[in-house]
């Protein structure tokens, strides 16, 4: 290499490493010595002693002399590599950066132009290989990732390029699976055009609002840099970014027109990178080969529209678990351009993850992390592509994506990534730059509503309003929380009387009401910096959310849990049969927003199995399978899913019941939490905690005792009390509600907790004492068996056993037994009569005297 190029190489090396901590090893300044040559491929590695060798940890940068041309080429050598068996100098892995890479970056002409709207060839995606004046390439010379991952082979290996999946798109069907109903066309009356002028007011209540895009405005370029520093940076037109993460994991999807770069990194799991580009674009990995021989990243063969690359820890090891995952997720982008398809499968995978955890089959479900995150990322990519190809976006599409991200990400981060419950986060700005406008609008709409008038509207209107609040409001709105509380209270009144039909609308209304009231765990702060108004709102939010948690717990009766479990069994049967279209909201239940943790216990599982329709036994593969799984595991799965609080993206029980953590005493495993009075809760456990006023129930299976504790905020003392058996006074003659604020609990001698009914008004109180005429099934003693019992928990900490329910036992005597008893009684009377007659007759006639005289 000539002296100018040598100076440039030195300048580039010095410039790049000057931004990082370095140390140098002084060497002799004598002329270059080439007495010791190390041959690497067709090049020679030598020490150039004319300048210091700059080192950064294990990374060494030096020049390479080409044997044929006697010219130097700038390169990076990674020393002391543990995972390579190649016998290179110092055990190093070496790749070249050719001197042509020092030229200024060059791009195709389309980068300076705008794509034609609706043209599939519109995306302009380029792979750049320039170093000079290109700050984006700095990580390639500084990264330590190359020390850890095998992503830079010199030649193709087996499985580097693999066959396309059978589920992906074909030339005859380039867009893949499309779900029903078809995508709605723009409505002229509800269309907002992006023409560069101030946008008109966006109606976020109308789900059919259309946002027409002017792609001429989307000219911002995105430069994608591989986290492995293994693929040269790729440029595309920016479309958005989707972020998902927690305290242990982060996934970022960089979206461009016709492009996606997904990066998944985790403390507990290996990383994975997926790149999607147009099928005529060739991404290039960084290795020592010249450009004409430079490899593409691993992945399947190109499809009719896209080409997919996947880099992971398992690229070199075909038997590796990550190798299987890489091949699976590589098919996702080409299976469908319908974002609903990917959201549906993300929901199904989430359900399968929860079911697997609940069944006890496996405690490690980390492989779901890659599958679910990849599905969600591809869903946002598919939506961005459909918007690009059609030039419009339905507001409903943006809301759907946002809702599913908020619903699924906390679950996958908690169970698959091992993150803490409160640490998850997610965001996406795909083709939607009016979130602030939408948020301001929904706040105004909610502030102006009249709650009494709103409650008179049909349920589908409630769903639209609460759905918008859930999607766009990042903080709880006072009116929305009050409205949600009133709405859930009305649903509770119908649910405890078994008069509610849990169709999809009712399930979604309950979910969005709970989510809109709870917010994103930013509401319950109470510190000295809060103003009076903020303090008042915080207290109201806490009080109403405690009430909602209590009402959902009360709605989760034993009978409802069984019916909800059957619904889940039906869904899992469809999952096994290969069903596609699904949302977790279809199986949402009050139990999933409650404070009941006992539904996975054996008694509740057996109750569920006893009512499963026979048709499901075949679908669920009953009988002993190869792995020993029976229908019983599906029962555990269903009830375990009911125990997941999917309505919250944080630990709602901990946040809404701070009294449970106000002392250092750790509670035993909790079955139920009942937040009654302010800063006071009942906690039901199997073992007595060392805190609170504690009651132990008599007449319960000693293997599964029931312990009730009344815990007050800040009171860390422990005391024991006895449950008294009483007959309740009839409160019908009083206008006041004597038992309001109390909780009625029905339980079995086996230790199973059946129902927990909250007495919130006079009507429920009257039903409590109505006996057999009660319209609330749990209050009807005629439905009780001798093994059932009931008690009442008052808000002041008093617990009483209800004698009227304990002593009521109705026995049905068979008629044959009754008539046989009557016949036996008559026969006994007849025999007794004969005996008495004989005795009396003998005495009167002096027969006994004659008998004695005869002797």
Curated annotation (Swiss-Prot):
Q: What is any one GO biological process for this UniProt entry?
A: symbiont entry into host cell
The membrane topology term of the UniProt record is: Single-pass type I membrane protein
**Which keywords fit this entry according to its UniProt record?**
Fusion of virus membrane with host cell membrane, Fusion of virus membrane with host membrane, Glycoprotein, Host cell membrane, Host endosome, Host membrane, Membrane, Sialic acid, Signal, Transmembrane, Transmembrane helix, Viral envelope protein, Viral penetration into host cytoplasm, Virion, Virus entry into host cell
Q: Which residues lie on this side of the membrane: Intravirion?
A: 837-855
Q: Which residues does UniProt assign to the signal peptide? A: 1-19
Q: Where is this region: Disordered?
A: 174-195
Family per UniProt?
Belongs to the herpesviridae glycoprotein H family.
Q: What is this protein called?
A: Envelope glycoprotein H
Q: What species does this protein belong to?
A: Equine herpesvirus 4 (strain 1942)
């Amino acid at each position: 290499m000539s002296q100018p190029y040598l100076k440039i190489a030195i300048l580039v090396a010095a410039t790049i490493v000057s931004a990082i901590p370095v140390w140098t090893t002084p060497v002799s300044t004598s002329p270059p010595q080439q007495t010791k040559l190390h041959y690497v491929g067709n090049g020679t590695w030598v020490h150039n002693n004319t300048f210091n060798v700059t080192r950064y940890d294990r990374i060494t940068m030096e020049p390479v002399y080409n044997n044929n041309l006697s010219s130097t080429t700038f390169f990076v050598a990674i020393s002391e590599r543990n995972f390579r068996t190649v016998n290179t100098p110092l055990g190093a892995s070496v790749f070249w950066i050719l001197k042509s890479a020092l030229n200024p970056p060059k791009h195709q002409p389309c980068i300076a132009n705008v794509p034609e709207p609706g043209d599939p060839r519109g995306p302009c995606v380029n792979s750049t290989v320039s170093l000079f004046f290109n700050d984006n390439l700095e990580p390639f010379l500084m990264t330590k990732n190359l020390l850890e991952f095998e992503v830079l082979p010199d030649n193709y290996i087996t499985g580097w390029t693999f066959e396309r999946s059978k589920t992906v798109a074909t030339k005859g069907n380039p867009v893949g699976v499309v779900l029903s109903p078809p995508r709605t066309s723009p409505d002229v009356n509800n269309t907002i055009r992006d023409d560069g002028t101030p946008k008109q007011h966006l109606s976020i209540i109308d789900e059919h609002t259309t946002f027409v895009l002017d792609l001429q405005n989307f000219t911002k370029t995105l430069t994608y840099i591989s986290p492995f520093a293994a693929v040269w940076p790729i440029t595309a037109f920016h479309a958005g970014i989707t972020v998902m993460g927690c305290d242990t994991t982060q996934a970022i999807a960089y979206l461009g027109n016709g492009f996606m770069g997904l990066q998944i990194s985790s403390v507990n799991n290996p990383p994975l990178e997926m790149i999607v580009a147009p099928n005529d674009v060739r991404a290039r990995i960084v290795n020592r080969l010249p450009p004409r021989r430079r490899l593409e990243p691993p992945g399947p063969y190109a499809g009719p529209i896209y080409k997919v690359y996947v880099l992971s820890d398992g690229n070199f090891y075909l038997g590796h678990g990550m190798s299987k995952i890489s091949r699976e997720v590589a098919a996702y982008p080409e299976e469908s351009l319908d974002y609903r398809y990917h959201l549906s499968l993300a929901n199904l995978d989430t359900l399968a993850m929860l079911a697997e955890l609940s069944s006890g089959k496996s405690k490690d479900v980390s492989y779901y992390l890659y599958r679910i995150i990849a599905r969600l990322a591809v869903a946002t990519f598919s939506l961005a592509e459909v918007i690009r190809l059609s030039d419009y976006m339905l507001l409903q599409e943006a809301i759907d994506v946002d809702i599913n991200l908020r619903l699924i990400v906390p679950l996958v981060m908690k169970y698959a990534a091992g993150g803490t419950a409160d640490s998850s986060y997610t965001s996406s700005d795909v083709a939607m730059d009016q979130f602030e406008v939408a948020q301001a609008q929904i706040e105004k709409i909610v502030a102006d509503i009249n709650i009494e008038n709103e409650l008179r509207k049909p349920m589908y209107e409630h769903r639209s309003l609460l759905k918008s609040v859930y999607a766009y409001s990042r903080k709880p709105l006072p009116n929305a929380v009050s409205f949600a509380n009133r709405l859930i209270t009305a649903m509770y009144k119908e649910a405890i009387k078994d008069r509610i039909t849990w169709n999809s609308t009712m399930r979604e209304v309950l979910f969005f009401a709970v989510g809109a009231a709870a917010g994103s765990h930013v509401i319950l702060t109470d510190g000295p910096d809060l103003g009076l108004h903020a303090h008042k709102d915080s207290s109201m939010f806490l009080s109403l959310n405690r009430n909602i948690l209590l009402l959902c717990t009360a709605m989760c009766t034993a009978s409802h849990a069984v019916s909800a479990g059957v619904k889940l069994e039906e869904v899992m049967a469809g999952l096994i049969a290969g069903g596609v279209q699904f949302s977790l909201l279809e199986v949402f239940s009050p139990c999933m927003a409650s404070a009941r943790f006992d539904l996975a216990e054996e008694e509740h599982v057996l109750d569920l199995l006893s009512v499963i329709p026979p048709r499901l036994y075949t679908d669920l593969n009953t009988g002993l399978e190869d792995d020993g799984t029976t229908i019983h595991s599906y029962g555990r799965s269903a009830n375990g899913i009911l125990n997941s609080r999917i309505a919250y993206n944080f630990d709602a029980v901990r946040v809404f019941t701070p009294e449970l953590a106000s002392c250092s005493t750790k509670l035993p495993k909790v079955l139920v939490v009942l937040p009654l009075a302010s800063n006071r809760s009942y906690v039901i456990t199997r073992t007595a905690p060392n805190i609170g006023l504690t009651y132990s129930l008599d007449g319960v299976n000693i293997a599964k005792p029931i312990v009730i504790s009344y815990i007050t905020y800040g009171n860390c003392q422990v005391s024991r009390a006895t449950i008294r058996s009483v007959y309740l006074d009839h409160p019908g003659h009083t206008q006041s509600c004597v038992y309001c604020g109390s909780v009625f609990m029905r339980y079995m001698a086996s230790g199973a907790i059946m129902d927990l009914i909250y007495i919130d008004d006079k009507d429920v109180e009257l039903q409590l004492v109505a006996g057999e005429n009660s319209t609330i099934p749990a209050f009807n003693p005629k439905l009780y068996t001798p093994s059932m019992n009931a008690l009442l928990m008052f808000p002041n900490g008093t617990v009483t056993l209800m004698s009227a329910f304990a002593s009521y036992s109705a026995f049905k005597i068979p008629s044959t037994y009754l008539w046989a008893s009557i016949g036996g009684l008559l026969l006994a009377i007849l025999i007794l009569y004969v005996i008495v007659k004989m005795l009396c007759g003998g005495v009167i006639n002096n027969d006994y005297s004659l008998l004695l005289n005869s002797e």
